[in-house]
Amino acid sequence: NIFKLHNEVCIFKFMDKFYVRELQIVNERVFLRSFNKKYADIMISNLRDLKCEGRVKKCYYVKEFSRKIQ
């Protein structure tokens, strides 16, 4: 169930593209939150198009970016 991944950083496949983003659920709307301010968050309109391919084990904040991902 995709709702169990709320606030988790994962590798998501959406519309045949892969993203490393944080899953956010706000007012029953699902978003893939970007860590880089240059990119917009992605609003998910159809949950069938979204698939979690894996979880990110470790990430931390650094000054240059909002989070460092390993």
How would you name each of these model-derived features?
Residues N1-Q70:
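Acidic/glycine-rich C-terminal interaction modules and beta/coil loop segments
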